[in-house]
UniProtKB/Swiss-Prot annotation:
Belongs to the universal ribosomal protein uL14 family. SMART domains: Ribosomal_L14. Keywords: Chloroplast, Plastid, Ribonucleoprotein, Ribosomal protein, RNA-binding, rRNA-binding. SUPFAM superfamilies: Ribosomal protein L14. It comes from Spinacia oleracea (Spinach). Signal peptide: none annotated. This is Large ribosomal subunit protein uL14c. HAMAP family: Ribosomal_uL14 (MF_01367).
Length: 121
């Protein structure tokens, strides 16, 4: 469960390393974001000489959470870290590579992210 002030790792090669959630997109007063939700975040740590800079406000989609995700068939998926992929206004990823496993629940809304992922669980 991602809420405002939560720090997340960046799971792509866009140039940012760490994000902090500011807001959850989708409802006026939603408290938590889960896998597949879009958040507004600020870059807390960035790689030098990249297009993204520290303290820049961006949008990202949550791809991994420590809080378990329960599927309809009873399977439970839990990751070791909270991670997000930076996206533009159209929902396309800014990076060209995705690091780590991605949940199958992203397939409907974010097909481009799933196609770049090395492993889909």
């Amino acid at each position: 469960m991602i809420q405002p002030q939560t720090h997340l790792n960046v799971a792509d090669n866009s140039g940012a390393r760490e994000l902090m959630c500011i807001r959850i997109i989708g409802a006026s007063n939603r408290r938590y974001a889960r896998i597949g939700d879009v958040i507004v975040a600020v870059i807390k740590e960035a790689i030098p000489n990249t297009p993204l800079e520290r303290s820049e406000v961006i949008r990202a989609v949550v791809v991994r959470t420590c809080k378990e995700l329960k599927r309809d068939n009873g399977m439970i998926i839990r990751y070791d870290d909270n991670a997000a992929v930076i996206i533009d206004q159209e929902g396309n990823p800014k990076g060209t590579r995705i690091f780590g496993a991605i949940a199958r629940e992203l397939r409907q809304k974010f097909a481009k992210i799933v196609s770049l992922a090395p492993e889909v669980l």
